[in-house]
Amino acid sequence: GMQFTEAGLSEDLSAIYDLGWFYDLRPEFKMVPEGVQVIYHVMENPVYQKTDVEGNTVLNKQRVASFFDLEQGKIANLKDINKCVQKLEEEYRSNGYILARVTDVHMEKDGTLKVAVNEGIVEGFKVKGNVKTKDYVVTREMKLKKGEPFNAKAARRSMQRVYNLGYFEDVNIKLNPG
């Protein structure tokens, strides 16, 4: 065989993990007359059964789950799951929900894929630099609402509505993490 090195072992472990089929991997070393034999003990991902979604309001559970087009009754592949996460996040972004993220995705032993979404909820508004009118005159023009997911398209419309009031030379939105 090959000469044993820690770097080689690390490369092997990474290559096996990168296949996406295993959630745990443990090398076992066995002394043989020729040197060391490495036996890899793998723990396969569970067999996929269904997707369970939480934290979503913009897209319903069925719509979110539809992005996870995994084959029921087959072993889940983490690479496929990660591609599904990317497609879902892109769907949110293309609809203006630029702060939405999948914050957790994991497989339960029973084959349930748990997906947690944070849609980037608006926690409130602060009006700064306003001396020409009451703040509520500005905030009533906001298409964004406290407690709803932030939407860049609605934010642009809101800025335009505030600008159209005629009180301000410039209107912009600054996002501050909550």
Label every model-predicted segment.
Residues 1-178:
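Periplasmic polypeptide-binding modules associated with outer-membrane biogenesis and secretion
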